[in-house]
Each structure stands twice: as structure tokens, then as C-alpha cells.
């Protein structure tokens, strides 16, 4: 715990530096940036009719495990003695100590920032080599763009030959200086009309239109998780099953609702229905189809095939819990990409991030004015930890008593659990 606390302390000093020197098109493990920013950047640079058509899909072999200690010690602006101790401390597996001669600290909270700072600079190298030039009075651009999320990255170009003979060797040399190598098997060059997978999305051009939709692997993995729940909880109450499934559906739907997901969502909804039908049939193998349908599926708002269960609330009143459907619960939502030069540690950017946070919360709290009022009244912060209440961390409405009066507060889930645990220990 002491080691993690010390890493957190040094990270507080290092992170503002890393943000200032970071590649503007790097999105992984950075404050206020997320996967969707990287996906939207891909969409923006590839959507036009004259956009680049060739993509290098980069894959680094064991990035976190092979970063050169010498490079880190020479280039990371922090106490070298402390950094050396963290890098050389090794790790314990099955009660056995293993030394570390390369790579960032295993499971260290400072490791993602160290990895980011190692990979930063590639965008600048590419920009300096492939500048816009004027040829016979016309402006010419090689259309070389980098988009990176942690150790996943793509590089675009107007032709395959430049990617294969110039850019790929340049990237390999950049990585080699840092103790890293590209995977020959997984680093491939793809045409945009064939499409490529990036951060769970398949990005492909049809004519002049770019479509970003869930990959087949992502759909398969999600349904495996759904079936794991239905098969692993054969005897649980319908209400409990719905709560478990809704948590997974909500997370998956919120991640993908910014893409072209209509067909994918309908397909997944149907597969979830089939999994639930099998779950119900196993419970009542001697009952007919109509009995099973009437027992578990109900007519709600005109939809007679709504998987729903009645339950009693804490106040004793009866309510109904319904299973979320991806197609109807998560309509397409336009995503606003972060501006590349915005720095969350820069006071001049504070107004931008405040507006961005409010616009996100307006979407999250749409139709719930009382919660929006509560959020503003609390200064947009959790009353327990003082950290922002936003879309990055799970939070909920918690009833409490203040000055002898009942009221509601928006509190982080983790803070609420910790508060209850501490109160229980005091008793």
C-alpha cells in the first residue's frame, strides 16, 4: 500500500508534465480522453472523399513488459533513484520472486503514464518527415496521420508503398530506441474499403461513407458474457437475473451507441432473447411455450415480449423491473470529440472542460431536472471524497439525513460503500 501511495504521489507531479508533452492524437490513459475520441479521430480523417485509403495497424509486442529501463531513466523527468527502484523491484508470483530487467512496474498506477511518455514523440517524427509541400503551385499532402490509444495505434497514408517501405521501418526504429518491437504477424497494412478493427469498432468505407460499428469479435465476446450469466444462474430469481444482465447491457450499449449500431443492436437483442428463452425452458421443462411466455414476458407499452419481473421496493411498494433492449434503450448519440490541444491541467482550458462536463451530464441526466439541480447544488462534486461527479465514475442517488431533515445526495458508489463500511466498524 505504501508503494502504491508513493506512486500516486509522484504521478501527481508527473502527469501534468506528460500532458504538456503528449502527442495531441494520443487518447489512452489520459485525463478527459477516452476510446471514443480515438475512434472519432479515425472517422474524421478517413470520412472525406479525398481522405487516405491505406492504414498501417500497429501492434507492439508486450509493450508494458519490454520498455527499456535505460530509456526511461534517461528521459522521464522524475527522481532517478526512486524510478530505478520501481523499475528493478521485480514481482512475486506463486510466492516466488522474479526480477525485472525491462518493462514498467507490474500493476503500478504510474505504469500507464510511463508507457504513454515512452510512445509520445512518434506523431512529431511523422509530421516532420511528411509535411505538406507545394508542387507546381499546388499544395500536396501525403495524408500521414497517427491515432494512438495506449499501445494500439494506426497510421494512415495515401498509398501502400510509402507505408510499407518508409513509415513501417521508421516506426520500427522509433520503437527499437525504446526497447520495443513491432509484431510482424499483427502489424498489417489494410485498405479502408476492406475495413480494420480498432478499439472494438470495425471502421470501413462504403463509397464515400465511413461506418464505425462493433466488431464481430466484440459481439461474440459480449454474448459469451451474457450466456455465462444465464447458464450460471439457472435457479436465481428473474429480478436478480435482470439486474445482472442490465448492468452488462448498459455498459456495452453506452460504449457503442456513438457508432452505426442499429443492425448490431437488433442482432444482439435477438440473441439475448434466445438465451433467456433457453434459461426459462430449463427452469420449466414440463411447461408449454405459452405458459413460459406468460410467466416471464409481459405487455409493457405495447410490447408483449418484454422480459420483466415485479419486485418490492424498500418502502414496501410494488414496482416492475424490465430488461433493457439495446436497440430501443441506446439510440444513436452524436459524440463530441475532445480538441487535441486541450490540457486538463492548464487553467486556461478550465472553462472548456467545465462546459464539456456539463454537456455530458445533460445527456446523462436528460429528463431528470431534479438530479441536474442536485448536481449543480453540490458543486458537481461528491460530498465524501470531493472529486467530481461525472460520467467517468459510477455514482448514485443516496438518501441521507442532514440537520434532522431527509434529503438526497449524489455520491460515488465506491465512496458510499466505504462510508457504510466505516460506519459499521464504528458500531
Show which residues each predicted segment covers.
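Histidine-centered nuclease catalytic patch
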Residues: 386-424
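A conserved non-catalytic segment of reverse transcriptases
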Residues: 88, 94-97, 178-252
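Duplex nucleic acid-engaging cores and interfaces of nucleic-acid transaction enzymes
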Residues: 1-9, 19-21, 35, 39, ...
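Conserved polymerase palm-domain catalytic core
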Residues: 21-25, 30, 37-195, 380, ...
